[in-house]
Amino acid sequence: MVKLDNVTEGVLDVINDNKFSQTGAFNLRENGTSICHGDSEHIKIKKKTDKPGIDIYIDGKTDGEAVYIPVVLSKSGMTDLVYNDFYVEDGADVRIVAGCGIHNSGCNESRHDGIHTFHVGKNANVRYEEKHYGEGNGTGARVLNPVTNIFVGENSVFTLDTAQIKGVDSTVRETLSLIHISEPT
């Protein structure tokens, strides 16, 4: 288990409702680097080899399980770009808890651009929770720019629950959703 500093623990408590732990399926990204991750029986997380980010594979036997993928930035002047791709098999029922917190006590802008793409199979149920939060007594801006691409299969449900808690100076959100529509019979 990786020992987390007080700033990271405090930010995680806010963006993950005191529920992040280094058990089950999880990946914690801190200051541009994945510092710890774990898999479960039905959820596997793999580091990308061609660009920063992870691929999350959720098998069809997943039933009510949660996966945590928070990001914490605590260095002033940092820009973090990450590509996370989710592959949800037919029939899966999963809760994905993301979120980003920036602690900026410096004078330079800190920024996180998270590009998340969801490939959801048929008859699946996905709940995606994303919270954004900023803190720190510095004058540097706290900027979060999420991009969410959602491709939903037949008879699937995708719930997007996003909140900006406080302390974020600027956000541009982009969301694209393509939903399978059955042909009339």
What are these regions (language model features)?
Residues 24-28, 35-178, 182:
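Conserved beta-strand/loop scaffold segments within soluble protein domains that form the structured core
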